[in-house]
Swiss-Prot record:
Record's protein name: Aspartyl/glutamyl-tRNA(Asn/Gln) amidotransferase subunit B
Subunit structure: Heterotrimer of A, B and C subunits.
Function: Allows the formation of correctly charged Asn-tRNA(Asn) or Gln-tRNA(Gln) through the transamidation of misacylated Asp-tRNA(Asn) or Glu-tRNA(Gln) in organisms which lack either or both of asparaginyl-tRNA or glutaminyl-tRNA synthetases. The reaction takes place in the presence of glutamine and ATP through an activated phospho-Asp-tRNA(Asn) or phospho-Glu-tRNA(Gln).
A Pfam family per the record: GatB_N
Length: 481
């Protein structure tokens, strides 16, 4: 039987406010345990929550960016459950009237096509504290620094049909919230976490299968692996005559499998009711206009502009628009070099490889946009070849200066004098007289392969400095003359 996968995601984004959603406590990461928890965060009697307006502004900004309905009358509710790191015994969230309603996001896929994923809603809520198991022998410690940190939970429609589509969607959300400046997107620190709802159904069936939720997956790689693992489990279970039970599961990356955590709850299990300590939030049209005026150029628009303005492919434009910093870096390089495609290639390949190797972000790049753009100018004016440029790039990354300084200091200037190149070729051909005879006796098909040998020898003889185009032209003339 052929199966169709159905995936919906819930993405929890920690908002980059300076203080918590209902108290004045700091949200800074990495503080000593329980040093950033106020009486409000601890759920002490006699204290009342006060809504952080900046969290509201950030939620509205996201809603406008995904063309969503904005809940201009939205209500906070109490989500009741017991867990050691939830001091009040309930979480303040939103249920029936969220701040962001239906919207959508267009995401780029690997094959260069676009897919629209519906967004069901996005609601504000407070984060819980953190249970610490490893630091205590046979016991659990509770750190409430995180309790009350503002979260925007973004709930998608079940529109994704593969793990790769799910990852593409998470990457698009990740890029968007970073562009907006509402979340730093640091998955390692838990700033962006993902719950994956996965089910399968026979191909062609309209009705959904029974879904399982994989909780708190915190990397793109693990999202793909966790979903694929759960897909395999469900298919094997059904094909062996079993039945999928609705439950919450955890992904174990060491065993590459999901394991049950608890039975999956429904909304009524949490006994939601409006929080009597918080008034409904009323958002005026004037506030929406203010927020709309602050929206930057977003990834979809930037991607589209890169394609139209620079003639880039969907893939290249999508990669370069991944973050504002990378897009700005690329545009600066392209502006200096006057060649967007050359700039795109160097930013994505050479610079990307360097950053991955050194574990750096684009804003920490050891080669500035001005340096890279200046080097590309030297490729374009034939001062250096593409091969020599890699040596220059490496030297710039090691702090040896800009391209012109390195070229002069190391004597890397390309030889473009046809007389000098001709002399090098004559010497090289004389040293390879036997191969020259074989080339001249060979048919056209074999000559193509043999020609590469002579080009390699010529570049070696010139220490890589001869202009490759001139080498090709002169060499062809000499071999066939």
């Amino acid at each position: 039987m052929q199966w169709e996968v159905v995936i919906g995601l819930e993405i929890h984004t920690q908002l980059t406010t300076q203080s918590k959603i209902f108290s004045g406590s700091s949200t800074a990461f990495g503080a000593e345990p329980n040093t950033q928890a106020s009486l409000i965060d601890l759920g002490m009697p006699g204290v009342l929550p006060v809504l952080n307006q900046e969290a509201v502004r950030m939620a509205v900004m996201f809603g406008l960016a995904v063309d969503a309905e904005i809940g201009q009358h939205n209500v906070f509710a109490r989500k009741n459950y017991f867990y050691p790191d939830l001091p009040k015994g309930y979480q303040i969230s939103q249920m029936e009237l969220p701040i962001v309603g239906k919207g959508h996001l267009d995401i780029p896929l690997e094959d260069g096509t676009m897919k629209r994923v519906g967004i069901t809603r996005a609601h504000l809520e407070e984060d819980a504290g953190k249970s610490l198991h490893e630091e205590f022998n046979g016991a659990t410690g509770i750190d409430l620094n995180r309790a009350g940190t503002p979260l925007l939970e973004i709930v998608s429609e079940p529109d994704m049909r593969s793990a790769k589509e799910a990852v593409a969607y998470v990457k698009s959300i990740h890029a968007l919230v970073r562009y907006l400046g509402i979340c730093d997107g640091n998955m390692a620190e838990g700033s962006l976490r993902c719950d994956c709802n996965v089910s399968i159904r026979p191909k062609g069936q309209v009705e959904f299968g029974t879904r399982c939720e994989i909780k708190n997956v915190n990397s793109f790689r693990f999202i793909e692996k966790a979903i694929n693992s759960e897909i395999r489990r469900q298919i094997e279970l059904i094909e062996d005559g079993g039945k999928v039970i609705q439950q919450t599961r955890l992904y174990d990356p060491n065993k590459d499998e999901t394991r049950p955590m608890r039975s999956k709850e429904e909304a009524n299990d949490y006994r939601y009711f409006p929080d009597p300590d918080l008034l409904p939030v009323v958002i005026e049209d004037s506030f929406l206009d203010q927020v709309r005026a602050t929206l930057p150029e977003l990834p979809p628009q930037k991607r589209e502009r890169f394609q139209e303005q620079f003639g880039l492919s969907v893939y290249d434009a999508s990669v370069l628009a991944t973050s504002r910093e990378q897009a700005d870096y690329f545009e600066k390089v392209a502006s200096i070099a006057g060649d967007a495609k050359l700039a795109a290639n160097w930013v994505m390949v050479e610079l990307g490889s360097l950053l991955n190797k050194q574990g750096l972000e684009i804003d920490e790049a050891p080669v500035s946009a001005e340096q890279l753009g200046g080097m590309l100018l030297r490729i374009k004016d034939n001062t250096i070849s593409g091969k020599i440029a890699k040596t220059v790039f490496e030297a710039m990354a090691n702090g040896e200066g800009n391209a012109d300084e390195i070229i002069d200091k190391r004597g890397l200037k390309q030889v473009t004098d046809s007389g000098a190149i001709s002399a090098v070729l004559d010497e090289m051909l004389a040293a390879n007289a036997e191969q020259v005879e074989q080339y001249r006796a060979a048919d056209e098909a074999k000559r193509g392969k043999m020609f590469g040998f002579f080009v390699g020898q010529a570049m070696k003889a010139s220490k890589g400095k001869a202009n490759p185009q001139q080498v090709n032209e002169l060499l062809k003339s000499k071999l066939e003359g």
